[in-house]
Amino acid sequence: LADEVYERLYYLDDTSSGAAPSFLDLAAPDDRLVVVQSFSKAFLMTGWRLGWLVMPASMTPQVGKLIEFNTSCAPVFVQRAAQVALAEVDAITPRVVAHLRQCRATLVPLLRQLPGVSTSSAPGGMYAFLRVDGHADSLALARRLVQEAGLGLAPGIAFGPEAEGWLRWCFASRDAGRLAEGVRRLGDWLAAGRPM
């Protein structure tokens, strides 16, 4: 099972398609590979809960039953929006990627300027992960940042034990200035020397 919902939100120029490398590029025709795709990310249809699967034809009957008994079908207006999105993919995706690339280029350098904060420049997606020295409990830190700095970040532990100690910052903002304001709030909070 390969979750490739962020495939189109890729910022490196090392593929001919501009998309992230796919497991489909490596799979043999008889592999039991199922690739999950979504309209939520690259088409900004978050919350509409519409996507698609790429899978061997032999799996279609069983997966069809699973879908029928769990979700039934997507509303017609959502399906029509998806048709337009697919028809306009060459116009939509580059604009979305350019905007997210700009937001990432705003957020990541500002975070790197904060003492005690480490982050990396994500090659894709719409999130930056950061670590704050001296704050190993990501849930406790996320709660404190909401209460004390007015800054809502996701705790790394929500994404599995490997992400404990990290925070996830969504940089999919309409206004990159809001990202700068968020970093200012984090910087002010850190400068106040708030102990854990």
Where are these regions (language model features)?
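PLP-dependent class I/II
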Residues: L1-M196
